[in-house]
From Swiss-Prot:
Residues 196-385 form the GMPS ATP-PPase domain. It comes from Alkaliphilus metalliredigens (strain QYMF). Homodimer. This is GMP synthase [glutamine-hydrolyzing]. NCBIfam families: guaA_Cterm, guaA_Nterm, PRK00074.1. Keywords: ATP-binding, Glutamine amidotransferase, GMP biosynthesis, Ligase, Nucleotide-binding, Purine biosynthesis. It is an enzyme of class 6 (ligase).
Amino acid sequence: MKQELVLILDFGGQYNQLIARRVREHNIYCEVVPYKITAEEIKLKNPKGLILTGGPSSVYGESTPRCEEEIFQLDIPILGICYGGQLMAHTLGGKVNRAKNREYGKTALQVDGNSKLFKEVAQDSICWMSHTDFIETAPAGFKITGTTADCPVAAMENQEKALYAVQFHPEVEHTEKGKEILKNFLYEVCHCQGDWTMENYIEKEIEAIRNLVGDRKVLCALSGGVDSSVAAVLVHQAIGDNLTCVFVDHGLLRKDEGDWVEDIFRNQFEMNFIRVNAEERFLGKLKGVTDPELKRKAIGELFIRVFEEEAQKIGDFDFLVQGTLYPDIIESGTETAAVIKSHHNVGGLPEDMKFQLIEPFKFLFKDEVRIAGLELGVPEEIVWRQPFPGPGLAVRVLGEITEEKLHIVREADAIVRDEIIKAGLHRQIWQYFAVLPNIMSVGVMGDERTYAHTIGIRAITSSDAMTADWARIPFEVLENMSRRIVNEVEGANRIVYDITSKPPSTVEWE
């Protein structure tokens, strides 16, 4: 029996990946595809439904993204969200106009409870709006099923043709009944059964890897992070000792992290595990480098070189495991994607290395990889690890990297993490760490003047890392961090707390 599928046509909206995650939460497999996908290609995939995403364009723009008009004639249920709804209205003969008052933020919504889309949804609720254009007149054959004070067509539908549109964003948490609305589209309109589970996904991946690899050899670049760790465990379950894991220790890890990774994978999982100590080479390469992008590129290039050297020592292998995630795939295929920071990944390996990639999680999101890890029996301390950048502490030490600065930020970071765990906040806070901003300040310790480094503490709350707010850590916990760092970490005499959200800031300082 073929697995149910929902296709999400990507028009460049900021919440597109969030839509996919919400669909998956309802146990339905979905894929994000470019808006240029043809009606014929859609028919071949045989989806249960289509979702047209939001986007920054206007339907009247010269180069505005449009899907094929034939898509609306396929007899496949369609939900248009924001721009996707405007495009549906415009294409089918409705009228879209520029709003006098742009709607942005939480908005009071009134809906028709007789609509399948709003089954068991309160008539009055709050939704999240983010638009400049709006649907002024619904196309012929459509019924208006939702309104706001400034939006006469906040929702519309042609029930006979299973075409639905909403001007608001049901995928974001600020829309009170957003999850229920999406669930209604998937189950009441598309008649999905909900046949997608992590257990089934893992079984299929293990079987596919086993059939692909056979008796051949596989190499895994293991960082100790969630993605590569869970990928290594899954592949190891599929092929056993035919997998060899290479762990490049670049000397930019958190306190005791290298030893911890080695113990987990060599001793607990009994994998073929090779640890390469390359600290001197990396610190030598970073000497005098202060620009954050140059630091990232230097680390990435040397990582590739070290990994390639080790691979040649091992001998012939046919496959390489990578912990690539679905957002990487989506962003690489999206015309509107922009590079904010270069990403450190083994994907930059030389083309002349003859191997085939195994990417078991290339269709999963981060939270789904964590679920997969728990299903596979991966220890919780790995599954719930803090996100950690590939360049490691090199991007948490601003300016030039030195052994002294690394030691200071490493010790301070260990204290921050320890105090968060002691306070029982480690599951509530998405990410927390110490930063050395390369700022010296005057202090007094005992009867002596000091001139030492400032340490920044960064802690954020988030559900998806696309947006984040600074964590309201209790003052007594912050006080404990500050007191311990100043007393226990030589070279630090001032502690500051970062209270900036994302946006405008990014999570990492570099």
